[in-house]
């Protein structure tokens, strides 16, 4: 029985982080498209530095700590504090496009959750619509996905999506893309250990270059991605 539960948990994790579902990230670049357009990211080294900065600034100090807190509030059925966390996540998306992406993912997740878990109270549904990350935490708990696995799956999806952006806009091919992904995921276990210890007053990152690139992307004339 436990083996079957672990299998269901693994399959649920694969589904929840899939980039091909409405909640996926392959249509977003989070400012990376503009960074490449303006020459801030023009080599593999630049690309790797961008991703590592995302891991060490945003993932460790914003995304994972907030995912963990939303997961906890789901566990204790505290919709009030869950909503506060969802709004806090949204406040950390400090450009129009980053906020819009977070809300679009949240609304897509809310529609799926409402179909699978009917009825859902308004207090939860409103929070889901605010944040895709918060919605993922709720669904991850409901699907018995351990928080560490959920966090690693989220990060893997984000890195894979960024590499897909690079694959389209930078001069490297599929084999290099696989090597990049393999290299970057090696940072994740230690990164999670750090994120797991982040206290409430320490939450908050400063990936300033991403914010600037995202703001520039709003007015970019020709673009392939939504952010």
From Swiss-Prot:
Coiled coil: none
The entry's keywords: Chaperone, Cytoplasm, Nickel insertion
Subcellular location: Cytoplasm
GO CC term (a single one): cytoplasm
Keyword Chaperone recorded: yes
GO molecular function terms listed in the Swiss-Prot or TrEMBL record: nickel cation binding
Main location: cytoplasm
Similarity comment: Belongs to the UreF family.
Known function: Required for maturation of urease via the functional incorporation of the urease nickel metallocenter.
Subunit structure: UreD, UreF and UreG form a complex that acts as a GTP-hydrolysis-dependent molecular chaperone, activating the urease apoprotein by helping to assemble the nickel containing metallocenter of UreC. The UreE protein probably delivers the nickel.
Name of the protein this chain belongs to: Urease accessory protein UreF
Species the sequence originates in: Blochmanniella floridana
